[in-house]
Design a protein with these regions (language model features):
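Short, solvent-exposed loop/turn segments at secondary-structure boundaries
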Residues: 22-26, 132-134
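A cross-domain feature marking catalytic cores of carbohydrate-active enzymes
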Residues: 15, 49-52, 124
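N-terminal nucleotide-binding beta1-loop-alpha1 segment
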Residues: 9-15
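A short alpha/beta connector and helix-capping loop motif
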Residues: 5-8, 24-54
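Short acidic, Gly/Ser-rich segments with clustered Asp/Glu that frequently serve as metal-coordination loops
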Residues: 17-21
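Active-site-adjacent betaalpha module
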Residues: 2-9, 42-43, 55-176
Length: 176
């Protein structure tokens, strides 16, 4: 099944100032999250971010804050009990997820979204945990649970559909 931009929402989980330095390959994960949010903006895909206890872990990184349409503060690891589903745009059943930590907040949120009937794509190169083992096991579990595991480039090209898209060159420059 292909992702469709007009049916998608980008969800960036906890790309926070005090959390990212602890994440394995945290700079690369943050860069990919910002790239995804930029692409979403160019293509009219709504972008929502979450922040886990922002008073302790700080706000999301500046690029994420600027590019997302909404930010949901939360205390649960799973963003759904804190109101995420109410914030998702109606009629968009494809949820594309990046962020941290893969094995905690992202995993629990993705599983709840699957349970709620959403189609979930997890962007592997835009997710991270402190431990690569935790990240890898979480991605495995998500795949076994019905989430589709993709990369930032896969998202970009599936959302654009063809090389004649008006933003093709802009997006190509972001991902190359």
């Amino acid at each position: 099944m292909l992702m469709k931009a007009d049916q998608s929402t980008l969800l960036l989980i906890d790309v926070q100032e005090r959390l990212m330095p602890a994440i394995s390959e945290g700079d690369a994960v943050a860069e990919r999250c910002i790239t995804l949010a930029t692409i979403a903006g160019l293509l009219g895909v709504p972008a929502i971010a979450t922040e886990q206890i922002p008073e302790k872990l700080g706000p999301n990184l500046e690029g994420v804050k600027e590019l997302c349409n909404k930010t949901l503060a939360k205390t649960h690891f799973d963003a759904c009990p804190d109101g995420l589903i109410d914030e998702l745009p109606e009629g968009r059943q494809h949820i594309v997820i990046g962020g941290c930590e893969t094995h905690v907040c992202m995993l629990q949120t993705a599983l709840s979204l699957l349970d709620a009937g959403y189609k979930v794509w997890v962007v592997a190169d835009a997710t991270g945990s402190r431990s690569e083992l935790d990240r890898d096991v979480a991605l495995d579990r998500l795949h076994q649970s019905g989430a589709r595991i993709v990369t930032t480039e896969m998202v970009a090209f599936e959302w654009m559909v063809h090389s004649k898209h008006p933003h093709f060159r802009d997006i190509q420059a972001l991902i190359k």
